[in-house]
A protein has these predicted regions:
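Catalytic core of membrane glycerolipid acyltransferases/transacylases, capturing the structured
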Residues: 1-18
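Non-catalytic C-terminal accessory region of glycerolipid acyltransferases
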Residues: 21-127
């Protein structure tokens, strides 16, 4: 997945307070230029972890504030199949692109963020 993330020009969310202002300015600029942003709402990706962890608010705050949809992607891990069985030892990663989720503009910003977060979590959880 690391190679896919780099290919998509992804960058980590800074933990240091002094770096966050620049980070959010880059995000605002990207959204104004209609760029696609990829974020892990859990805060980081744990390869081969098969449960959905709690989502942080940052990605949803960004989407709700900018009134842009989020595009959930569910990563699942499956045993190698087909030709992959011959040489792959670790599980294969499957990505399922789910329906986009739009912010509910009838809600105030705080509720909009929470609503977006909850709907994304529900959509990604495997039944």
């Amino acid at each position: 997945i690391r190679h896919l993330i780099r290919l998509l020009h992804a960058f980590p969310i800074p933990k240091e307070k002094e770096k966050k202002k620049d980070f959010y300015e880059q995000i605002d600029s990207a959204l104004k230029h209609k760029k696609i942003l990829q974020m892990y709402p859990e805060g980081s990706l744990w390869p081969y972890y098969d449960k959905v962890r709690n989502f942080k608010y940052g990605a949803f705050k960004i989407a709700a504030s900018a009134n842009v949809p989020i595009q959930p992607i569910r990563f699942t891990f499956v045993k190698p199949y087909g030709i992959y069985r011959l040489y792959k030892k670790k599980d294969c990663i499957e990505a399922t692109i789910l329906d986009p989720i739009y912010p509910n503009l009838d809600l105030d910003l705080t509720r909009r963020i929470e609503d977006l977060r909850e709907r994304a979590y529900i959509s990604i959880k495997v039944e």
